[in-house]
């Protein structure tokens, strides 16, 4: 059923009040970020029921008003392939990300991009320079493709739902993406991909790998504040992985530098040598002598032995914060150190998400924006009128009562940053 008039949509909603459904948005341009895009159409199928294609901007149909999207909240649960994408189009309640459900069970993404029609392939190949191609692809071809796509959602929508990942983490990543980053004279948008083998999100869009902007060349230089009275502020966690592991193992690092503390156990070494040695032991093999003489790595070794034993015995382990299940069946060529590295990256990710859940409400009434999160750092586009109290508030939330100290830096662009830790 093609739905192109508001009263048709009203009738569809009334017939299916509170019923669960599948939703597949069709954006006008397949190559542009959802935040730089417009809505072409939305496919809806009631679970075990009827279907409809809602037309918002297509050359063959009349147009529904975009405000009518909010009436979809009168339906029940809404199963989608990409909740984060939908968040950028419209915020609806009771949305379940089926790709996330599948990933939590299989540790990989749904096979989705492979689904197409000959017509879609032709238009995308021949008219690759044209914008908003989906508006001219025959509407019935969109219907045909959506009918194939919904079969994938129907196959997996009954898998278990991890509510904290589905709601908290996806919404946090949506929030950061919505801020964008000023690059040269425009705003560019990042796209976080949560569905990686380790659980640590990647972040790339439009040929830019935002998670790996090089500090040494000038890759970061085009990025600057969008505000006339603004600067970039970055907070970096100090010795983050060591402190994360220390926290879950109840190892109390003294105030000051972790690497200076660890030097006490390594003999006559420099600060940099101490740092490199600690990371070598953390991510590789811990020598028996270190296990016997270093209380931190003694606990780390015991923890690695425990989770490896649990992994072999139970065929899974759970992450430390959000209790994500890591299944043995989904990981090949696993060993004890590799498993520990997975757990560290997952611990890092989940702790960052936990912090973001506290940070985002603090940012809601501020003009400054959180624009990038990269493993152990958070980058803000800071409007000076938000004041020093804003930066101190951010620092307090990030450091979680002093458990995870940060260093801070500022710059007119992301390449030329100067340390301001002592000023905060």
Which residues make up each language-model segment?
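Short amphipathic alpha-helical segments
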Residues: 1-2, 11, 46, 133, ...
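Helical catalytic core of nucleic-acid polymerases
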Residues: 87-157, 161-179, 214-336
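C-terminal polymerase-core module
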Residues: 181-182, 285-292, 299-343, 381, ...
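Generic structural signal for residues in well-ordered beta-strands
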Residues: 92-95, 370, 406-408
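Acidic, glycine-rich two-metal-ion catalytic cores of nucleic acid-processing enzymes
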Residues: 2-3, 11-18, 24-52, 56-60, ...
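Conserved DEDDh/DEDDy metal-dependent 3′-5′ exonuclease domain
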Residues: 2-10, 16-152
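A glycine-rich phosphate-binding loop feature that marks nucleotide/adenosyl-phosphate handling sites
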Residues: 99, 165-169, 185, 193, ...
């Amino acid at each position: 059923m093609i739905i192109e008039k508001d009263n048709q949509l009203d009738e569809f909603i009334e017939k299916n009040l509170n019923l669960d459904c599948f939703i597949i948005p069709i954006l006008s341009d397949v190559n542009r970020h959802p935040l730089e895009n417009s809505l072409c159409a939305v496919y809806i199928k009631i679970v075990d029921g009827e279907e409809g294609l809602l037309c918002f901007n297509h050359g063959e149909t009349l147009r529904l008003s975009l405000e009518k999207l909010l009436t979809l909240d009168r339906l029940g649960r809404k199963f989608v392939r990409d909740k984060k994408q939908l968040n950028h189009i419209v915020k609806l309640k009771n949305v379940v990300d089926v790709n996330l459900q599948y990933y939590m069970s299989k540790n990989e993404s749904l096979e989705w991009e492979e689904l197409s029609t000959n017509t879609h392939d032709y238009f995308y190949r021949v008219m690759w320079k044209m914008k908003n191609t989906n508006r001219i692809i025959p509407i019935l071809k969109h219907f045909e493709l959506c009918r194939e796509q919904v079969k994938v959602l129907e196959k997996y929508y009954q898998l278990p739902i991890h509510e904290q990942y589905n709601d908290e983490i996806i919404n946090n990543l949506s929030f950061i993406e919505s801020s964008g980053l000023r690059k040269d004279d425009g705003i560019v948008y990042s796209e976080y991909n949560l569905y990686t083998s380790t659980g640590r999100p990647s972040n790339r869009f439009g040929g830019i790998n935002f998670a790996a902007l090089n500090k040494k060349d000038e890759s970061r230089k085009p990025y600057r504040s969008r505000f006339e009275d603004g600067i970039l502020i970055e907070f970096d966690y100090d010795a983050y992985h060591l402190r994360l592991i220390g926290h879950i193992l109840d190892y109390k690092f003294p105030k000051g530098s972790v690497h200076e503390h660890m030097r006490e156990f390594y003999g006559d070494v420099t600060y940099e040598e101490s740092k490199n040695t600690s990371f070598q032991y953390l991510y590789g093999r811990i020598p028996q002598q270190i296990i016997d003489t270093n209380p931190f790595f003694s606990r780390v070794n015991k923890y690695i032995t425990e989770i490896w034993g649990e992994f072999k015995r139970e065929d899974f382990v759970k992450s430390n914060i959000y209790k994500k299940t890591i299944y043995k069946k989904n990981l090949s060529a696993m060993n004890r150190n590799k498993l520990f590295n997975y757990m560290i990256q997952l611990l890092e990710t989940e702790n960052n998400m936990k912090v973001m859940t506290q940070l985002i409400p603090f940012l809601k009434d501020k003009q400054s924006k959180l624009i990038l999160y990269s493993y152990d750092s958070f980058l803000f586009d800071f409007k000076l009128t938000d004041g020093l109290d804003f930066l101190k508030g951010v620092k307090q939330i990030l450091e979680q009562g002093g458990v995870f100290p940060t260093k801070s830096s500022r710059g007119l662009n992301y390449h030329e940053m100067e340390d301001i830790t002592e000023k905060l």
